[in-house]
């Protein structure tokens, strides 16, 4: 049996859609919504029942929080998986070129924890940053200007739907991907000029300090300020353009062309707008 966690989230819900109706799949949500098992990593007592009878766990990262919170969640999940007799964990991690991001630590800790497990087989999906994310951090303002501090840097963004397809491929045939690490970044790196041109906007990158101040007064949680500013500066300084890793995306999509990240960005901007 395959258990997918976090199916009320953006990535997990896409995975759940692709697995709908399969009798060998169960879905997990923190609240234990109808038709799902309650999987609350902040309440480890819920996990033995949730993991009962599970052979493969697709652990969608519970990365919304401070490092110690996320690490504790993932430790609870992996300890419970070991105790329940889960054989294989597929984990949605962060691209290998993302080590300069402040939220990389919890991902790398989880990867190390998986590798050191005496009983678990594993597959690590090192997901690149979503094309949809760009709609949240680099959308044009009311004056049709994109002022996100991306500098002249570029992001090898990847469509969330493609990552969901890969997760399903791996999680439904885990033995074929045993103890493998896959890099999943986009094939086309996008810069601020690209984003502006497709929207008929102007790219006028602002200062990182201005972005930090704006995030701080926007109602963001304290841990989100360094998350977002590190994303901006990693893009601006060329660490997320895809040249630092070799992407396995197309191979794991069965050879099909990945979705166009620029198209995904445009659609997301229009939905958010």
Regions picked out by a protein language model, each given a short descriptive name:
Residues 1-24, 42, 52, 62-69, ...:
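Oxidoreductase cofactor-interface core, primarily capturing Rossmann-like NAD(P)-dependent enzymes
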Residues 13, 41-44, 71, 75, ...:
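Structural motif corresponding to alpha-helix initiation and N-cap regions
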Residues 27-32, 40-42:
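N-terminal Rossmann-fold cofactor-binding loop
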Residues 37-55:
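Conserved Rossmann-fold cofactor-binding substructure of NAD(P)-dependent oxidoreductases
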Residues 48, 75-78, 160-168, 259-266:
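Short, amphipathic alpha-helical "lid/cap" segments that border enzyme active or binding sites
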Residues 73-77, 109-110:
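A general structural detector for well-ordered alpha-helical segments in enzyme core domains, enriched
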Residues 212-273:
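A hydrophobic C-terminal alpha-helical subdomain
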